[in-house]
Amino acid sequence: FLKEDVADPCQPVRFREDNGWLVRFYYYRERISVEVFHALSDGGGAIVFFRTLLAEYLRQTGVDVPAGNGVLDLNEPPREEELEDAYARYAGSRTLRGKLEKTAFPNTSAPEPFYTLNVTLGLVPVDRLREVAKSYQATITEYLTAVLLQCLLENQAARRFRHPQPVALAIPINLRPWFPSETLRNFILTMR
């Protein structure tokens, strides 16, 4: 439940560990982080939970942090909108099946042990990043997606495949801007 930070984040959630909690908290020096099982919430809901938790921690140390701006009021019961299954409201029982897509380029490198993830940390001034993205008439997400796709194309070209394959990324899309919802539950769609 509360652990010292680990080298390999996003390990499988084992329901019998940590008394059934589907949330993990990590600390390292003055940094804390949280992992939330995807069935509980997406990044949008998880950040509200994390902000609220941090606000309560600060309150208990004597710092006044008001509710609002992504911090829930712990003296109020959860609102129905926060608990809503927005998928059920907007999609109902309908499912959409995409066309079968061609197999994408396998961007593989030296094998890692099972469930090993490598974390790369970079700091970029967001104003400068927004400016560069805007110069391509793109959002930051669109621009970074294009940069990643370009890297995949260059990686494939360097390997000199006889028959190049399409490159693909799985991008999580927050559905709240298109389907109004205040749910704190998972409400994303992964696009390829």
Describe these PLM feature segments.
Residues 1, 68-124, 171:
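Short amphipathic alpha-helices and their capping loops
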Residues 28-33, 126, 189-190:
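Glycine-rich, often proline-containing surface loops adjacent to acidic residues and nearby aromatics
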Residues 35-51, 119-161:
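Acyl activation and transfer enzymes in specialized metabolism, enriched
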Residues 1-24, 121, 153-192:
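Acyl-thioester-dependent acyl-group transfer interface
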Residues 1-7, 37-41, 109-123, 132-135, ...:
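Acyl-group handling in specialized metabolite and lipid biosynthesis
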Residues 22, 33-35, 54-61, 107-119, ...:
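Short, contiguous, well-ordered secondary-structure segments
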Residues 63-72, 159-167:
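Short, glycine/acidic-rich hinge or "gate" loops at secondary-structure transitions
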Residues 1-51, 55-59:
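Acyl-thioester-dependent condensation/acyltransferase catalytic cores
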